Amino acid sequence: MAIHYETKATNVGGRKGHVYTDDRALDIDIVPPAQADGKATNPEQLFAAGYASCFNGAFDLILKQNKVRDAHPEVTLTVRLEDDSDSESPKLSVSIDATIKNVISQEEAEKYLQMAHEFCPYSKATQGNINVDLNVNVVD
């Protein structure tokens, strides 16, 4: 299989440390969620940002492939760190909340959102591993 892209990130210090990418485009302190101060981030925020961006790209592509124009999709991804009844360590769950302009029906929007979920590399990577809630609102 062909590799389309590869990147590296290095962390020193775990959840109370620092992370940077090989090109230094990302170079930021890491803190536990309870210690967030606006100057540092945490793994959950980084995951939410990456997944939201990837998913919205997939959603936009699916809409365009199906000749839906001017939908202007927006995706907000909520990441939760929650108790895991099967383990002592917590687990992640996510909600994907998409909004598009009123250019298609709610039913069509839900169909295309599901197609985006099947296409998105983050969704594929997490499939069967975390609970994912999918929601879409069609707005004026």
Swiss-Prot record:
Family: Belongs to the OsmC/Ohr family.
GO terms, biological process: response to oxidative stress
Source domain of life: Bacteria
InterPro entries documented for this protein: KH_dom-like_a/b, OHR, OsmC/Ohr_fam, OsmC/Ohrsf
Pfam families per the UniProt record, alphabetical: OsmC
Organism: Staphylococcus aureus (strain NCTC 8325 / PS 47)
SUPFAM superfamilies: OsmC-like
Gene3D superfamilies: 2.20.25.10, 3.30.300.20
The protein's name: Organic hydroperoxide resistance protein-like
